Amino acid sequence: MLLLNPLPRLFEDTMLNRAIVLFVVLLAGAGAVVQANRPETAPPRASFDNFPIELAGWKGQSLPPMDAKILQILGVDDYMNRAYFRADRASAGLYVGYYKSQRQGDAIHSPQNCLPGAGWEPMENGYLTVPIAAAGLPTEISENRYVIQKGLDRQLVLYWYQSHGRVIANEYWSKFYLIRDAVTLNRTDAALVRVIVPIAASLENAESRAETQAVDFVQKLFPLLPAYLPS
């Protein structure tokens, strides 16, 4: 189910986001007092080095390591940056950045801020609900859906925040849970999961095709993530 920038939803989200921000500020103040002398502990997890290179019809390859300056800016403790391909030449770029702690200034960077900095302009934005068929997991997950463009090139971007078994599309809700879990669980570990699929201008219904490919990739990817992003 696709929601493309609906105005009533946008207004409701804006009001809700303001309320969340206020609550996060209040909760953060309380958390700073409660957690001042408590060392943070994150559950053990598998390294992305061990993440499968093949995902049920998708075969991947690791991209060159990121520049040290970029990694310093991102502040990730572990990350995965790969390109995956299907036999029918469909492709998907996968980035997952994991943060063991977000207490010392290292925080997840939203693609909404990073992609324009790389020259990509947002053309459409909304939410996409992806059905998941795997035991012990949600039956569907909600993700951010963006179409971006640079020159004549267009790409479809799906991304979400994942922490402690939750999949969160809204950036403000992710901040709320970050502070709440810091207070109640003494944990701030979390990850950003981003999937990018090129939109082939030469194909009919190119955007719809790209979305179908992205959904298929997410459905193969998501059931494997819990071992690397602990709940």
Question: Where in this protein do the model-derived segments appear?
Answer:
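N-terminal Lys/Arg-rich, disordered targeting/topogenic segments
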Residues: 1-10
